[in-house]
């Protein structure tokens, strides 16, 4: 009986430790990675696996040539929210685009990455 309890307690601790030390992973991007869109998207929305620290989260958009694209209203939905978004105020011309993001999760881990999409009406 004692061995079962110790095994159960150890398993619980390992599961808890795994979630505590997890980094925020990008789970959903809109536009989706590799998507080809018929029209310019109105916004970028990135959903992560962990809560985010709003003051330390940023997203940028650039044409494949590296030319930056203006974004408006960059925001995280609030303390602990998992969504980082920004509006695209002007229609994008046809071409390839790169979304770059840097976030700090509520557990203090920094992560970054990219996502690409194409506008081809």
Positions of PLM-derived features:
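Cleavable N-terminal signal peptides
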Residues: 9-10, 20
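Short, solvent-exposed loop/linker segments at the N-terminal edge
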Residues: 35-40
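N-terminal signal peptide c-region/cleavage motif recognized by signal peptidases
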Residues: 15-19
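Short, surface-exposed alpha-helix to beta-strand junction/turn motifs within ectodomains of secreted
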Residues: 44-46, 50-72
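Bacterial N-terminal signal peptides that target proteins for export
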Residues: 1-9
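Interdomain boundary/hinge segments at the C-termini of tandem beta-sandwich modules
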Residues: 119-121
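Short, exposed beta-strand-loop hairpins at the edges of beta-sheets
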Residues: 93, 100-116
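Cleaved targeting-peptide boundary
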Residues: 20-29
């Amino acid at each position: 009986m004692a061995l079962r309890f110790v095994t159960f307690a150890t398993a619980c601790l390992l599961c808890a430790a795994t979630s505590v030390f997890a980094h925020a992973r990008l789970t959903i991007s809109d536009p989706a990675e590799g998507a080809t869109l018929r029209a310019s998207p109105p916004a970028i929305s990135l959903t992560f696996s962990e809560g985010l620290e709003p003051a330390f989260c940023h997203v940028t958009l650039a044409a494949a040539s590296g030319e930056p694209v203006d974004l408006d209203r960059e925001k995280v939905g609030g303390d602990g929210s998992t969504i980082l978004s920004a509006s695209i105020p002007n229609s994008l011309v046809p071409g390839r685009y790169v979304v770059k993001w840097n976030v700090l999760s509520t557990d203090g881990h920094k992560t970054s990455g990219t996502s690409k999409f194409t506008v081809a009406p």
